[in-house]
């Protein structure tokens, strides 16, 4: 929700501070929008006493009214775990019509995964060790293959070995299957037995083929994972790389990051020199807040403020001419304080 600032004059007295607090509270109640009381200087002893007496918080200090990132329309997108599969990340992007996902851990940004990164993952088809290199969790493999875990620990990780397809006889399989490999195969008992005897770490049984009690028992004794999938061998081989965790392909270095208190003028300058569409925004504690896009930045509007207890530029916060003054509420004389659009004025003697 867009926030409007309600602020009194410099060197504020009790009248100025309390007017800002009261009017912001009134506007919040009658409009349903967000108005925040601010101050343009330090509070004096009298004001501090009054606020403490009535248990009212002191408004935060506002140095100027230049537009900041926190004034922009930041798009909040829930972060994903680095363990999420490429397939699930793609589905999330498609459902939410977004091109970038934040990868977070405890609300801290770890990296970004983009559609371009996912496209790159599809091109890594010649590296049959990539599942192990990426430390892929068996749970991801089960889900990606629409499979069922028959034996083994789904929370374990495929850490060593390569991915192979056992499309030949057991005699030939012995020549290319090595210890800790992940083997994709069909319903042939002899092939399944050979893969176990070669000490594979995982068997992917395709087309929902039955798995004998003997094979299952041998796998359990050797702590070998067996996954049953309804897909054929070709489809399983195509899908399996989509189980790789996003942290393997995400961008984590040289990210262009902005903070809530950054000024928009600076942000525009930086954005003009980069090719990215979406930029992650962090708060002052490093918590991920959302994305600011080029398009949203181009449609930015000035900070909207309401002046109370004054209406002269020399009394106002610095650079007041850079803001849109939407209202002036004062009991003094009216002075010429230009803004666009013209403010609504209330003056009472």
Predicted regions and their residues:
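Bateman/CBS regulatory modules and CBS-like beta-alpha motifs in cytosolic regions of diverse proteins
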Residues: 5, 60-92, 104, 138-189, ...
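Short, ordered loop/turn segments at secondary-structure junctions
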Residues: 10-11, 40-42, 106, 115-118, ...
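Conserved small/polar residues in nucleotide/adenosyl-binding loops
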Residues: 1-5, 338-348
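N-terminal beta-loop-helix "entrance" segment that forms/cooperates
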Residues: 37-56
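Short hydrophobic alpha-helical runs that function as membrane-insertion/retention elements
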Residues: 36, 59-61, 101-102, 182-185, ...
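Active-site cofactor/cluster-binding pocket
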Residues: 56-58, 63, 302-337
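Short beta->alpha transition motifs characteristic of CBS
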Residues: 98, 102, 109-125, 231, ...
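Histidine-anchored nucleotide/phosphate-binding helix
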Residues: 19-27
């Amino acid at each position: 929700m867009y926030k409007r600032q309600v602020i009194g004059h410099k060197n504020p007295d009790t009248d100025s501070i309390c007017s800002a607090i009261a009017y912001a509270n009134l506007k919040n109640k009658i409009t349903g929008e967000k108005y925040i009381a601010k101050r343009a200087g330090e509070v004096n002893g009298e004001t501090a006493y009054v606020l403490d007496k009535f248990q009212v918080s002191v408004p935060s200090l506002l140095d100027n009214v230049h537009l900041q990132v926190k004034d922009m329309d930041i798009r909040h997108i829930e972060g994903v775990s680095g363990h999420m599969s490429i397939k699930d990340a793609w589905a999330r992007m498609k459902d939410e019509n977004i091109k970038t996902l934040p990868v977070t851990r405890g609300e801290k940004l770890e990296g970004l995964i983009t559609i371009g990164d996912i496209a790159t993952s599809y091109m890594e088809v010649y590296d049959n060790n990539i599942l192990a290199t990426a430390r892929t969790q068996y749970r991801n493999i089960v889900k990606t293959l629409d499979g069922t875990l028959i034996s083994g620990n789904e929370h374990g990780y495929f850490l060593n070995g390569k991915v192979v397809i056992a499309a030949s006889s057991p005699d030939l399989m012995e020549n290319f299957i090595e210890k800790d490999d992940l083997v994709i195969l069909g319903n042939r008992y002899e092939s399944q037995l050979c893969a176990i005897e070669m000490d594979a770490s995982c068997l992917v049984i395709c087309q929902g083929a039955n798995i004998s009690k003997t094979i299952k028992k041998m796998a359990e004794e050797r702590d070998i994972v067996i996954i049953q999938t309804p897909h054929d061998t070709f489809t399983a081989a195509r899908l399996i790389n989509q189980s790789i965790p996003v942290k393997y392909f995400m961008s984590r270095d040289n990210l262009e990051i902005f903070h809530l208190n950054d000024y928009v003028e600076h942000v525009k300058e930086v954005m003009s020199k980069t090719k990215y569409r979406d930029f992650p925004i962090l708060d002052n504690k490093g918590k991920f807040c959302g994305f600011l896009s080029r398009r949203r930045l181009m449609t930015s509007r000035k900070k909207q403020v309401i002046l109370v207890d004054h209406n002269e530029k020399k009394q106002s916060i610095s650079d007041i001419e850079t803001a849109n003054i939407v209202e002036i509420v004062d009991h003094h004389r009216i002075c010429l304080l230009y803004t666009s659009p013209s403010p609504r004025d209330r003056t009472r003697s």
